[in-house]
């Protein structure tokens, strides 16, 4: 095998809670993570030249060490003492800086692909331990599916597949700094924390309506204050028949869950021809863990 193509799937947070802050600045979280069928495509080809070369369809993306795919390649080369270089084509579809772990998923797929290409025989657990060096979301992006995420995001408990539904993704054209959101999050006795345990129970019972009623994200209190259009999108999606709508991660992406295909498609078509059309997607949950 001298070339490999992989799909790097996006994630949403069905629930996101922040428990507290560590002395080192990291935050302890409890999250329900869900992979969706929106993906980037990554093609990797080893080269005799030792350099790492990345080509992408987005002109503004860095193709050097500031790209997490490059960093993943460098980590893999150094860990397994590989002299070959890599040519990588990265076709982005997941919105960038959107709270959907697009970069982390690209890094995860890269590690998985290199493990296959060079037959380094690393288990999923081995790759996850390697991946956490790149970012807290990378281990989950290797695991995929439905999972409870704790610690700083690296402690993962796989859950049964969440009840499937139609998932409409809308990303408004604003930029959100994850660092800014966490730094400005105020946790006190008035903080409304998600019912994570209740959502786990709803998922285990395959109760879509109960699960949808419990979607919640403490980071909304920061991001929506600075970008009120997120709240407007949520309310509008509810008026289109969504069971619920929520900001994913630190934002600004909003997802809406539908149990009715026609309602989901109607909302999708309306948004597709509107100002958010380029960053609007209708998808479903992803269950399989195969790349």
UniProtKB/Swiss-Prot annotation:
It comes from the Bacteria. One of its GO terms (biological process) is isopentenyl diphosphate biosynthetic process, methylerythritol 4-phosphate pathway. Its EC number is 2.7.1.148. The keyword Phosphoprotein does not apply. Transmembrane segments: none annotated. The gene is ispE. It catalyses: 4-CDP-2-C-methyl-D-erythritol + ATP = 4-CDP-2-C-methyl-D-erythritol 2-phosphate + ADP + H(+). GO terms for molecular function: 4-(cytidine 5'-diphospho)-2-C-methyl-D-erythritol kinase activity; ATP binding. Pfam families: GHMP_kinases_C, GHMP_kinases_N. The active site is at 11, 137. Keywords: ATP-binding, Isoprene biosynthesis, Kinase, Nucleotide-binding, Transferase. InterPro entries: GHMP_kinase_C_dom, GHMP_kinase_C_sf, GHMP_kinase_N_dom, IspE, Ribosomal_Su5_D2-typ_SF, Ribsml_uS5_D2-typ_fold_subgr. ATP binds at residues 95-105. Coiled coil: none annotated. Catalyzes the phosphorylation of the position 2 hydroxy group of 4-diphosphocytidyl-2C-methyl-D-erythritol. Belongs to the GHMP kinase family. IspE subfamily. Pathway: Isoprenoid biosynthesis; isopentenyl diphosphate biosynthesis via DXP pathway; isopentenyl diphosphate from 1-deoxy-D-xylulose 5-phosphate: step 3/6. HAMAP family: IspE. This is 4-diphosphocytidyl-2-C-methyl-D-erythritol kinase. NCBIfam families: ispE, PRK14608.1. PANTHER family: 4-DIPHOSPHOCYTIDYL-2-C-METHYL-D-ERYTHRITOL KINASE, CHLOROPLASTIC. It comes from Lachnoclostridium phytofermentans (strain ATCC 700394 / DSM 18823 / ISDg).
